[in-house]
């Protein structure tokens, strides 16, 4: 963890013990924590961590996936399939990434975007970025 890092934790229910441990650790280290949850699911979920806490007990801000509870897209016979929260949270992550890049550009800075290896000159561009972010890119 780097002191400059902001953490985003994604969970439909926000009650899993390992997730709570990670949220607790982030806050103990003084990091800003943003939770991405499905509020309808979160509100009905019982805490599973021994502390009785859930993700929003640690989050500085949260984003709501706004999917239904239960989190299903289709009824196939007796089965419920196609969880929407996975798709919605992925789209939200891409939108957040795009907005961060937009903020870089609108503030006159070069956005640190790694290019596909298929793009001509990507190796030179990407090496410059990995040099700048040495030790932070995995």
Language-model segments: residues:
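Glycine-rich phosphate-binding loops that contact phosphosugars or nucleotide phosphates
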Residues: 1-98
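Active-site phosphate/pyrophosphate-binding segments
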Residues: 102-138
